[in-house]
Regions:
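Pyridoxal 5′-phosphate
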Residues: 1-404
Protein backbone atom coordinates (compact mmCIF):
# COMPACT_ATOMS: atom_id res chain seq x y z
CA UNK A 1 0.00 0.00 0.00
CA UNK A 2 2.80 2.43 0.91
CA UNK A 3 4.43 2.13 -2.51
CA UNK A 4 1.26 3.47 -4.13
CA UNK A 5 1.75 6.79 -2.34
CA UNK A 6 5.54 7.15 -2.01
CA UNK A 7 5.80 9.17 -5.20
CA UNK A 8 3.41 11.75 -3.72
CA UNK A 9 6.12 12.84 -1.26
CA UNK A 10 9.08 14.66 -2.83
CA UNK A 11 11.37 14.31 0.18
CA UNK A 12 10.88 10.56 0.36
CA UNK A 13 11.87 10.29 -3.29
CA UNK A 14 14.93 12.52 -3.00
CA UNK A 15 16.45 11.40 0.32
CA UNK A 16 17.96 8.05 1.23
CA UNK A 17 16.44 7.96 4.69
CA UNK A 18 13.99 5.74 6.50
CA UNK A 19 11.94 8.57 7.98
CA UNK A 20 10.43 7.20 11.20
CA UNK A 21 9.88 10.43 13.13
CA UNK A 22 6.33 11.07 11.99
CA UNK A 23 5.02 11.81 15.49
CA UNK A 24 7.27 14.88 15.48
CA UNK A 25 6.27 16.02 12.00
CA UNK A 26 4.99 14.27 8.91
CA UNK A 27 6.21 14.71 5.36
CA UNK A 28 4.16 16.76 2.90
CA UNK A 29 2.67 15.41 -0.32
CA UNK A 30 3.17 17.35 -3.53
CA UNK A 31 -0.44 18.51 -3.52
CA UNK A 32 0.17 20.40 -0.26
CA UNK A 33 3.29 22.07 -1.64
CA UNK A 34 1.35 22.95 -4.78
CA UNK A 35 -1.52 24.48 -2.81
CA UNK A 36 0.79 26.77 -0.85
CA UNK A 37 2.70 27.76 -3.98
CA UNK A 38 -0.50 28.36 -5.94
CA UNK A 39 -1.82 30.69 -3.25
CA UNK A 40 1.28 32.85 -3.48
CA UNK A 41 1.29 32.69 -7.28
CA UNK A 42 -2.34 33.55 -7.94
CA UNK A 43 -4.15 34.63 -4.75
CA UNK A 44 -1.54 36.53 -2.75
CA UNK A 45 -3.33 39.40 -1.03
CA UNK A 46 -4.43 40.16 2.51
CA UNK A 47 -7.61 38.15 3.16
CA UNK A 48 -10.71 39.55 4.84
CA UNK A 49 -9.76 43.18 4.20
CA UNK A 50 -9.91 44.10 0.51
CA UNK A 51 -12.81 44.44 -1.93
CA UNK A 52 -10.68 43.81 -5.01
CA UNK A 53 -10.57 40.41 -6.76
CA UNK A 54 -7.22 39.20 -5.38
CA UNK A 55 -8.24 39.85 -1.78
CA UNK A 56 -11.63 38.26 -2.36
CA UNK A 57 -9.93 35.16 -3.80
CA UNK A 58 -7.56 35.01 -0.81
CA UNK A 59 -10.52 35.28 1.55
CA UNK A 60 -12.33 32.47 -0.27
CA UNK A 61 -9.25 30.23 -0.04
CA UNK A 62 -8.94 30.93 3.67
CA UNK A 63 -12.60 30.38 4.50
CA UNK A 64 -12.78 27.29 2.27
CA UNK A 65 -9.95 25.86 4.37
CA UNK A 66 -11.93 26.59 7.51
CA UNK A 67 -14.92 24.72 6.11
CA UNK A 68 -12.65 21.78 5.19
CA UNK A 69 -11.45 21.61 8.79
CA UNK A 70 -15.02 21.84 10.07
CA UNK A 71 -15.96 18.86 7.93
CA UNK A 72 -12.79 16.97 8.93
CA UNK A 73 -13.70 17.30 12.62
CA UNK A 74 -17.47 17.19 12.10
CA UNK A 75 -17.95 20.43 14.01
CA UNK A 76 -21.43 21.96 13.89
CA UNK A 77 -20.32 25.30 12.49
CA UNK A 78 -17.28 26.86 10.85
CA UNK A 79 -17.57 29.55 13.53
CA UNK A 80 -16.21 26.91 15.92
CA UNK A 81 -12.96 26.58 13.96
CA UNK A 82 -10.15 28.97 14.95
CA UNK A 83 -6.88 29.02 13.02
CA UNK A 84 -3.73 29.28 15.14
CA UNK A 85 -0.04 28.51 14.65
CA UNK A 86 -0.10 25.03 16.21
CA UNK A 87 -1.53 22.85 18.96
CA UNK A 88 0.51 24.67 21.59
CA UNK A 89 -0.98 28.04 20.70
CA UNK A 90 -4.47 26.56 20.52
CA UNK A 91 -4.27 25.19 24.06
CA UNK A 92 -2.71 28.40 25.35
CA UNK A 93 -5.63 30.30 23.83
CA UNK A 94 -8.02 28.19 25.89
CA UNK A 95 -5.89 28.50 29.02
CA UNK A 96 -5.56 32.28 28.89
CA UNK A 97 -9.02 33.08 27.56
CA UNK A 98 -11.20 30.42 29.21
CA UNK A 99 -9.00 29.14 32.04
CA UNK A 100 -8.07 32.45 33.63
CA UNK A 101 -11.70 33.59 33.38
CA UNK A 102 -13.25 30.50 34.95
CA UNK A 103 -10.72 28.94 37.33
CA UNK A 104 -10.68 30.59 40.75
CA UNK A 105 -8.81 30.11 44.02
CA UNK A 106 -9.58 26.70 45.49
CA UNK A 107 -10.71 25.22 42.17
CA UNK A 108 -9.08 22.20 40.54
CA UNK A 109 -7.74 21.38 37.08
CA UNK A 110 -7.31 17.71 36.21
CA UNK A 111 -4.78 16.55 33.62
CA UNK A 112 -3.50 13.12 32.62
CA UNK A 113 0.06 12.07 33.39
CA UNK A 114 0.43 11.35 29.65
CA UNK A 115 0.28 14.98 28.54
CA UNK A 116 2.71 16.60 26.17
CA UNK A 117 4.08 19.70 27.87
CA UNK A 118 1.82 21.77 25.60
CA UNK A 119 -1.23 20.45 27.45
CA UNK A 120 0.41 20.67 30.87
CA UNK A 121 2.35 23.93 31.20
CA UNK A 122 -0.65 26.14 30.30
CA UNK A 123 -2.66 24.53 33.12
CA UNK A 124 0.24 24.89 35.53
CA UNK A 125 0.18 28.60 34.65
CA UNK A 126 -3.59 28.87 35.17
CA UNK A 127 -3.45 27.13 38.55
CA UNK A 128 -0.49 29.21 39.68
CA UNK A 129 -2.15 32.50 38.76
CA UNK A 130 -5.60 31.54 40.03
CA UNK A 131 -4.52 29.83 43.23
CA UNK A 132 -6.07 26.56 42.07
CA UNK A 133 -4.82 22.98 42.41
CA UNK A 134 -3.49 20.81 39.59
CA UNK A 135 -4.30 17.11 39.89
CA UNK A 136 -3.15 14.17 37.76
CA UNK A 137 -4.92 11.17 36.29
CA UNK A 138 -2.32 8.42 36.42
CA UNK A 139 -2.34 5.57 33.92
CA UNK A 140 -1.43 1.91 34.00
CA UNK A 141 1.97 0.94 32.65
CA UNK A 142 0.42 0.20 29.25
CA UNK A 143 -1.16 3.66 29.15
CA UNK A 144 -4.68 2.62 30.11
CA UNK A 145 -6.73 5.13 32.08
CA UNK A 146 -8.87 3.56 34.80
CA UNK A 147 -12.13 5.50 34.53
CA UNK A 148 -13.17 4.52 38.05
CA UNK A 149 -10.02 6.16 39.39
CA UNK A 150 -10.60 9.18 37.17
CA UNK A 151 -14.17 9.53 38.41
CA UNK A 152 -12.90 9.56 41.99
CA UNK A 153 -10.58 12.46 41.16
CA UNK A 154 -13.31 14.67 39.70
CA UNK A 155 -15.06 16.80 42.30
CA UNK A 156 -17.40 19.82 42.31
CA UNK A 157 -14.19 21.90 42.43
CA UNK A 158 -13.02 20.53 39.06
CA UNK A 159 -13.37 23.20 36.37
CA UNK A 160 -11.20 21.81 33.56
CA UNK A 161 -10.18 18.30 32.52
CA UNK A 162 -7.34 18.19 29.98
CA UNK A 163 -6.31 15.01 28.21
CA UNK A 164 -4.42 13.94 25.13
CA UNK A 165 -6.45 11.94 22.61
CA UNK A 166 -3.40 9.82 21.74
CA UNK A 167 -0.22 9.72 23.82
CA UNK A 168 2.85 10.80 21.85
CA UNK A 169 4.93 8.32 23.89
CA UNK A 170 2.69 5.28 24.27
CA UNK A 171 0.37 5.69 21.29
CA UNK A 172 -2.60 4.85 23.49
CA UNK A 173 -6.01 6.16 22.38
CA UNK A 174 -7.71 7.60 25.44
CA UNK A 175 -11.46 7.24 26.17
CA UNK A 176 -12.36 10.85 25.39
CA UNK A 177 -16.12 10.43 25.20
CA UNK A 178 -16.19 8.77 28.62
CA UNK A 179 -13.94 11.48 30.06
CA UNK A 180 -16.26 14.11 28.61
CA UNK A 181 -19.24 12.53 30.35
CA UNK A 182 -17.42 12.51 33.69
CA UNK A 183 -16.26 16.10 33.26
CA UNK A 184 -19.66 17.41 32.21
CA UNK A 185 -21.40 15.64 35.08
CA UNK A 186 -19.28 17.78 37.43
CA UNK A 187 -19.82 20.95 35.41
CA UNK A 188 -16.26 20.95 34.02
CA UNK A 189 -15.10 21.34 30.43
CA UNK A 190 -12.87 18.90 28.54
CA UNK A 191 -9.83 20.14 26.60
CA UNK A 192 -8.38 17.58 24.17
CA UNK A 193 -4.90 17.60 22.63
CA UNK A 194 -5.52 15.98 19.25
CA UNK A 195 -2.06 16.44 17.76
CA UNK A 196 -1.35 12.70 17.60
CA UNK A 197 -4.85 11.45 16.85
CA UNK A 198 -5.73 13.49 13.76
CA UNK A 199 -3.07 11.81 11.55
CA UNK A 200 -4.21 8.31 12.47
CA UNK A 201 -7.89 8.02 13.36
CA UNK A 202 -11.14 9.75 12.37
CA UNK A 203 -12.11 12.56 14.72
CA UNK A 204 -15.72 13.56 15.35
CA UNK A 205 -15.80 16.30 17.97
CA UNK A 206 -19.56 16.00 18.36
CA UNK A 207 -19.38 12.26 19.00
CA UNK A 208 -16.44 12.78 21.38
CA UNK A 209 -18.42 15.54 23.12
CA UNK A 210 -15.21 17.54 23.54
CA UNK A 211 -15.51 21.19 24.52
CA UNK A 212 -12.16 22.13 22.98
CA UNK A 213 -10.00 20.13 20.56
CA UNK A 214 -6.60 21.23 19.21
CA UNK A 215 -4.31 19.93 16.49
CA UNK A 216 -1.42 20.97 14.24
CA UNK A 217 -1.39 20.94 10.46
CA UNK A 218 2.18 19.70 10.16
CA UNK A 219 1.44 16.38 11.85
CA UNK A 220 -1.42 15.60 9.46
CA UNK A 221 0.68 16.11 6.29
CA UNK A 222 0.01 19.86 6.11
CA UNK A 223 2.33 22.85 6.41
CA UNK A 224 4.13 23.99 9.51
CA UNK A 225 2.79 27.19 11.04
CA UNK A 226 -0.93 26.41 10.85
CA UNK A 227 -2.91 24.91 13.71
CA UNK A 228 -6.54 24.56 14.69
CA UNK A 229 -8.64 25.07 17.76
CA UNK A 230 -12.17 23.71 17.79
CA UNK A 231 -14.36 25.11 20.54
CA UNK A 232 -18.06 24.92 21.30
CA UNK A 233 -19.65 28.05 19.90
CA UNK A 234 -21.35 29.03 23.14
CA UNK A 235 -18.05 28.78 25.04
CA UNK A 236 -16.07 30.72 22.43
CA UNK A 237 -18.71 33.44 22.31
CA UNK A 238 -18.38 34.01 26.05
CA UNK A 239 -14.56 34.07 26.05
CA UNK A 240 -12.48 37.26 25.79
CA UNK A 241 -9.96 37.50 22.93
CA UNK A 242 -6.54 35.93 23.42
CA UNK A 243 -4.74 38.49 21.24
CA UNK A 244 -5.92 41.94 20.20
CA UNK A 245 -5.14 44.08 17.17
CA UNK A 246 -6.08 44.18 13.54
CA UNK A 247 -9.02 42.34 11.98
CA UNK A 248 -10.47 41.00 15.23
CA UNK A 249 -12.64 44.09 15.81
CA UNK A 250 -15.90 45.58 14.60
CA UNK A 251 -15.07 49.10 15.73
CA UNK A 252 -12.49 50.98 17.79
CA UNK A 253 -12.73 54.28 19.66
CA UNK A 254 -10.34 56.12 21.93
CA UNK A 255 -11.92 54.39 24.88
CA UNK A 256 -12.31 50.81 23.73
CA UNK A 257 -13.39 48.39 21.04
CA UNK A 258 -16.21 46.15 19.92
CA UNK A 259 -14.76 42.78 19.02
CA UNK A 260 -15.59 40.82 15.88
CA UNK A 261 -17.86 37.82 15.93
CA UNK A 262 -16.57 34.26 15.73
CA UNK A 263 -14.25 33.01 14.48
CA UNK A 264 -12.37 36.23 13.71
CA UNK A 265 -12.44 37.42 17.32
CA UNK A 266 -9.59 34.98 17.97
CA UNK A 267 -7.58 35.60 14.77
CA UNK A 268 -5.81 38.91 15.33
CA UNK A 269 -3.52 40.33 12.65
CA UNK A 270 -2.76 39.12 9.15
CA UNK A 271 -3.82 35.50 8.89
CA UNK A 272 -1.78 32.58 7.54
CA UNK A 273 -3.94 32.01 4.48
CA UNK A 274 -1.31 30.23 2.40
CA UNK A 275 -0.74 27.51 4.98
CA UNK A 276 -4.48 27.27 5.57
CA UNK A 277 -4.77 26.45 1.86
CA UNK A 278 -2.05 23.85 2.35
CA UNK A 279 -3.92 22.33 5.28
CA UNK A 280 -7.05 22.17 3.12
CA UNK A 281 -5.07 20.19 0.53
CA UNK A 282 -3.69 17.89 3.24
CA UNK A 283 -7.17 17.14 4.54
CA UNK A 284 -8.40 16.37 1.03
CA UNK A 285 -5.39 14.10 0.54
CA UNK A 286 -6.03 12.17 3.77
CA UNK A 287 -9.70 11.78 2.86
CA UNK A 288 -8.76 10.45 -0.59
CA UNK A 289 -6.79 7.61 1.01
CA UNK A 290 -9.06 6.99 3.97
CA UNK A 291 -8.21 6.28 7.59
CA UNK A 292 -9.09 2.59 7.23
CA UNK A 293 -6.37 1.98 4.66
CA UNK A 294 -3.89 4.15 6.55
CA UNK A 295 -4.60 2.35 9.82
CA UNK A 296 -4.19 -1.09 8.26
CA UNK A 297 -0.76 -0.19 6.89
CA UNK A 298 0.40 1.38 10.15
CA UNK A 299 -0.75 -1.59 12.23
CA UNK A 300 0.92 -4.06 9.86
CA UNK A 301 4.22 -2.18 10.10
CA UNK A 302 3.93 -1.81 13.88
CA UNK A 303 3.26 -5.53 14.23
CA UNK A 304 6.28 -6.36 12.05
CA UNK A 305 8.49 -4.19 14.23
CA UNK A 306 7.12 -5.32 17.59
CA UNK A 307 7.21 -9.01 16.67
CA UNK A 308 10.89 -8.73 15.78
CA UNK A 309 11.75 -6.61 18.81
CA UNK A 310 10.02 -9.20 20.98
CA UNK A 311 12.79 -11.62 19.96
CA UNK A 312 15.50 -9.17 21.12
CA UNK A 313 16.04 -9.75 24.87
CA UNK A 314 17.75 -6.40 25.49
CA UNK A 315 15.14 -4.23 23.74
CA UNK A 316 11.97 -3.17 25.53
CA UNK A 317 8.87 -1.47 24.06
CA UNK A 318 6.82 0.81 26.29
CA UNK A 319 3.05 0.61 26.34
CA UNK A 320 0.61 -2.01 25.16
CA UNK A 321 1.71 -5.39 23.83
CA UNK A 322 -0.89 -5.04 21.06
CA UNK A 323 0.38 -3.35 17.87
CA UNK A 324 -3.08 -2.01 17.05
CA UNK A 325 -2.99 0.06 20.27
CA UNK A 326 0.07 2.13 19.33
CA UNK A 327 -1.07 4.45 16.50
CA UNK A 328 2.26 3.71 14.84
CA UNK A 329 4.30 4.87 17.87
CA UNK A 330 7.00 2.49 19.10
CA UNK A 331 8.86 3.90 22.09
CA UNK A 332 11.66 1.67 23.29
CA UNK A 333 14.84 1.30 25.30
CA UNK A 334 17.93 -0.85 24.79
CA UNK A 335 19.74 -2.18 27.85
CA UNK A 336 23.00 -0.32 28.40
CA UNK A 337 22.59 2.06 25.46
CA UNK A 338 21.57 5.66 25.98
CA UNK A 339 18.68 6.73 23.72
CA UNK A 340 20.78 9.54 22.25
CA UNK A 341 23.38 6.95 21.22
CA UNK A 342 20.59 4.83 19.75
CA UNK A 343 19.40 7.77 17.69
CA UNK A 344 22.88 8.74 16.50
CA UNK A 345 23.81 5.20 15.48
CA UNK A 346 20.52 4.73 13.65
CA UNK A 347 21.03 8.08 11.93
CA UNK A 348 24.39 6.84 10.66
CA UNK A 349 22.47 3.92 9.16
CA UNK A 350 20.01 6.27 7.47
CA UNK A 351 17.18 5.75 9.95
CA UNK A 352 15.54 8.85 11.45
CA UNK A 353 13.96 8.41 14.89
CA UNK A 354 13.52 10.56 18.00
CA UNK A 355 15.39 10.31 21.31
CA UNK A 356 14.80 12.12 24.59
CA UNK A 357 11.80 12.82 26.79
CA UNK A 358 9.48 13.69 23.87
CA UNK A 359 8.15 16.78 25.71
CA UNK A 360 6.50 14.44 28.20
CA UNK A 361 8.87 14.44 31.16
CA UNK A 362 6.26 13.74 33.88
CA UNK A 363 5.11 10.63 32.00
CA UNK A 364 8.63 9.28 31.53
CA UNK A 365 9.43 9.98 35.18
CA UNK A 366 6.24 8.09 36.12
CA UNK A 367 7.34 5.19 33.89
CA UNK A 368 10.84 5.41 35.41
CA UNK A 369 12.53 6.16 32.10
CA UNK A 370 14.33 9.53 32.00
CA UNK A 371 14.84 9.13 28.26
CA UNK A 372 13.70 6.78 25.51
CA UNK A 373 13.99 6.23 21.77
CA UNK A 374 10.88 6.53 19.60
CA UNK A 375 10.15 5.31 16.11
CA UNK A 376 6.84 6.59 14.75
CA UNK A 377 5.30 5.22 11.59
CA UNK A 378 3.06 6.64 8.89
CA UNK A 379 1.09 4.98 6.13
CA UNK A 380 3.80 5.83 3.58
CA UNK A 381 6.47 3.86 5.43
CA UNK A 382 7.46 0.47 4.03
CA UNK A 383 8.43 -2.96 5.28
CA UNK A 384 11.98 -2.39 4.05
CA UNK A 385 12.23 0.76 6.17
CA UNK A 386 11.03 -1.13 9.23
CA UNK A 387 13.57 -3.87 8.48
CA UNK A 388 16.26 -1.21 8.22
CA UNK A 389 15.28 -0.02 11.69
CA UNK A 390 15.31 -3.56 13.06
CA UNK A 391 18.69 -4.38 11.54
CA UNK A 392 20.20 -1.34 13.22
CA UNK A 393 18.58 -2.03 16.59
CA UNK A 394 19.72 -5.66 16.56
CA UNK A 395 23.39 -4.64 16.32
CA UNK A 396 23.34 -1.69 18.73
CA UNK A 397 24.78 -3.40 21.78
CA UNK A 398 27.49 -5.12 19.78
CA UNK A 399 28.50 -1.82 18.19
CA UNK A 400 28.60 -0.22 21.63
CA UNK A 401 31.02 -2.91 22.82
CA UNK A 402 28.62 -5.08 24.83
CA UNK A 403 28.83 -8.08 22.55
CA UNK A 404 25.75 -9.77 21.16
Amino acid sequence: MAHAYRDDFPLLKSQDVAYLDNAATAQRPQCVLDAVTEFYKSQNANPLRGLYPLSIAATEAYENAREAVRSFLNAKSSREIIFTRNTTESINLVAYSYGLSHVKAGDEVLVSIMEHHSNLLPWQMVCRQAGASLKFMECEMDGTLDLNKVEALITPKTKIVACTHVSNVLGRVNPIRELAALAHRAGAVLVVDGAQSTPHIPVDVQALDADFFAFSGHKVYGPMGIGVLYGREELLNAMPPFLTGGEMIESVTRDGAVFAELPHKFEAGTVNAADAAGLHAAIDYVKSIGFTAMHQQEVALTRRAMDAIGEMPHVHVLGSEKPEEHCGIITFTVDGVHPHDISEILASDGVAIRAGHHCAQPLLAYLKHPSTARASLAFYNTESEVDRLLDSISTLRERMGYGK
